[in-house]
Regions:
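Short N-terminal or domain-adjacent regulatory/targeting segments
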Residues: 1-31, 40
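Glycine-rich, highly charged phosphate/nucleotide-binding loops
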Residues: 14-18, 81-99
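Histidine-anchored nucleotide/phosphate-binding helix
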Residues: 34-57, 61
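Structural motif
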Residues: 36-40, 65, 112-114
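Short, polar loop motifs at secondary-structure junctions
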Residues: 63-69, 134-140
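An aromatic- and histidine-rich active-site surface loop
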Residues: 114-127
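Active-site-proximal region of nucleotide-activated glycan assembly enzymes
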Residues: 139-172
């Protein structure tokens, strides 16, 4: 890990998302999902979004974009662009960006970034969701679905659907 990431992780350690009751939400009970993705991963989320729409599950994508403003992606699904101006020097999002994302209630948050990408890690920590999912181990996440380095985001999202179908809830 770089010195910059170490400093960012230290700064992030003092921040918390608003409290939310943690819960493993099965696929059949999902209503709102947040995907944290980088602009080069947008084509990989389309199949997941289509699968969700068939089940009347709303999906919102937080797109981390570091490019030029005039080349900002305009995907055909519910999204929020987080550009360079919405992060500080260390990659931690500003209050406004987090407030915008926290204005919706999410059952599940899915981080498509990796352990070294502090921007997606910071958003994952600061946004409220009942269940947080990633493909790497971190205390922030409730479910970590291990995949190898060659697994692309589309395959990972297919695995997320499989795992969410496997969750069983007991009603008392």
């Amino acid at each position: 890990m770089s010195l910059l990431n170490n400093i960012a992780n230290y700064l992030l350690s003092s921040k918390e998302s608003p409290k939310c009751a943690k819960q493993f939400v099965p696929w059949s009970q999902l209503s709102n999902v947040l995907i944290i993705a980088f602009d080069n991963q947008l084509s990989n989320v389309v199949n997941f979004i289509n699968a969700c729409q068939k089940e009347n599950i709303k999906v919102h994508v937080a797109v981390i974009y570091d490019g030029k403003l005039e080349q900002t992606p305009k995907p055909n699904f519910d999204h929020h662009i987080l550009d360079k101006k919405q992060f500080n020097f260390f990659g931690i999002p500003n209050e406004g960006a987090i407030e915008t994302l926290n204005s919706k209630q999410f059952d599940t948050l899915i981080n498509l970034g990796n352990a070294e990408q502090i921007k997606s890690l910071a958003i994952s920590k600061l946004v409220t969701a009942k269940c947080k999912i990633s493909h790497f181990q971190n205390p922030i996440f409730d479910i970590s679905i291990d995949g190898d380095k060659t697994t692309n985001s589309s395959k990972f999202l297919e695995q997320v659907i499989v795992y969410l179908h496997m969750i069983k809830t007991t009603h008392k």
